[in-house]
């Protein structure tokens, strides 16, 4: 498995039994043989912080600092994860949950394999901010569970002070989340209020 190196693995369990494992930075080797097409259910308990140094290791630092090559209209920053009381953002690139395929391939940066997975995420949060992730959400007290009907290559998590604009077209809900006080776009959609559902269809 691969996991952010700043996250400390406290135990790896199978059927209630602790398994031996070895940790080498982001690599976790579990001492449990597995046969071809065999299925195992493991519980990996971990805690800690997020190291952003593990993100996009295939991109050279000088490429980020090069201001003479007009790759895009703006410069990229060097922040890839946020964990604070006011804003949280975790993306698959920071390996905030265990994965079986490394997020980068230094030998062939454009040939990165993806492992599509049936993700279910439960977040325990008692604050007043909005919790978002991929999938359909269900709130049960302080727990918010996100379930997905299809396999995904990865999931993200964000918690922030968001406002929401929503529109239902037929049986599909469309939602836009934005930081409170940053609604600079709604006025441009007012002339389309009657025709927007038809445009979406």
Q: Model-predicted segments: where are they?
A:
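Short coil-to-beta strand junction motifs in C2/discoidin
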Residues: 2-7, 113-117
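A surface-exposed beta-strand-loop module
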Residues: 5-66
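Beta-strand signatures of extracellular beta-sandwich domains
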Residues: 2, 11-13, 120-122
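A mature extracytoplasmic/lumenal domain signature
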Residues: 2-5, 16-18, 34, 46-48, ...
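Short aromatic-centered micro-motifs
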Residues: 12-13, 131, 167
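Extended, low-hydrophobicity, Ser/Thr/Pro/Gly-biased non-transmembrane segments
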Residues: 45-156
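Juxtacatalytic substrate-recognition/specificity segment
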Residues: 121, 167-201
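C-terminal beta-strand-rich structural cap/linker in extracellular carbohydrate-active enzymes
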Residues: 36-42, 149-162
